[in-house]
Amino acid sequence: MVSAMPDATLCPRCGAESHYLLTPRDRTEGPPASIRLCASRVCGVGFTEPAPDDLAAAPAASPSGEVEHRLASRIVSAGLSHLMRRLAPGDTVVDVGAGSGLRARVLAERGFRVIAIEPDPAEEMRAHAMMSSLPAGARVEVVRAGVDELPAVMDGRTAQAAVMWHVLEHLHHLDAGLGTVAGVLADGGLLGVAVPNRRSAEARAFGPRWHGWEPSRHRWHFDEDSLRLVLGASRFSVADIGTRGGWGYPSGVAYSIAPGLDPQVHPGTGLLGRALAAAMIPVAATARAVGHGGQLVTIARRAAR
């Protein structure tokens, strides 16, 4: 028996009945009294029930010193490596949910033209600050906008790639958001996606305490099959999917062990938190290498119109 809790909740995505997964422990609020995670019996997508009040991503901790910046940049670069290798210098990349701007900066430093959108005003300002020391010639736009405003931002332009790095799990309207991103990509354009892997060894090991659940902000919870289905429904064909990318999800291991060092929840712990995450790279990389890492990284290609 999976759980004694009732299975009456309907999936908000496909409308099918669901089954109970677990009751998570929120990293900021402790064990919630009524929140539970369920998964559709048809589309397989997991979801937080009831829906979180605040689906915005937690503010990312900006690197505060040279050592921390180098470490954070290396982690981001490793995660994006599979996508960047498939692009040509000068290609346009849309960073959806740019946060503090570190990912957009890494892409710009590699010679791509970057259009970074971020709906949170404070994060948008931090992203602008992140770009202030870019070398001459770097091409990057930072715009305060959500996914639904992306067509207006692009104003008829198309991109060769888009990045949704830990964004899908926050979207109010999952399929509509993916469809909007697909609409600004050129035929054959690439989409790079990263989401927490709910079937990972880390999720099983930490159970309700796993950092990747984040029930106060994550509406959706994916495994490989459900992510494939969702992308396919928005006319993306998956070119590569799995946990074998970059260094895995070391922060998921680190902050599940020591939530007090999570810089998103406890500002001022950035260097210590990232140092712990770096120390967890061998653990995360081992899980990644055998296909059970905490982060699913996907490269998908947009179908021709």
Specify the residue positions occupied by each region the protein language model found.
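Conserved N-terminal segment of class I S-adenosyl-L-methionine
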Residues: V2-W165, D175-G179, T243-R244, H266, ...
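Short glycine/proline- and charge-enriched loop/turn segments
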Residues: A60-V67, F206-P215, A254-Q264
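Short N-terminal helix/helix-N-cap motif within the alpha/beta-hydrolase-1
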Residues: H172-A176, A203
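A short glycine-rich, Lys/Arg-flanked "PGG" loop and its adjoining helix->strand segment in the class I
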Residues: D175-L190
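Conserved Class I S-adenosyl-L-methionine
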Residues: I281-A300
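Short catalytic micro-motifs in class I SAM-dependent methyltransferases
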Residues: W165-H172, A194
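Short, glycine-/aromatic-enriched active-site segment of Class I SAM-dependent methyltransferases
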Residues: V193-W220, D225-V230
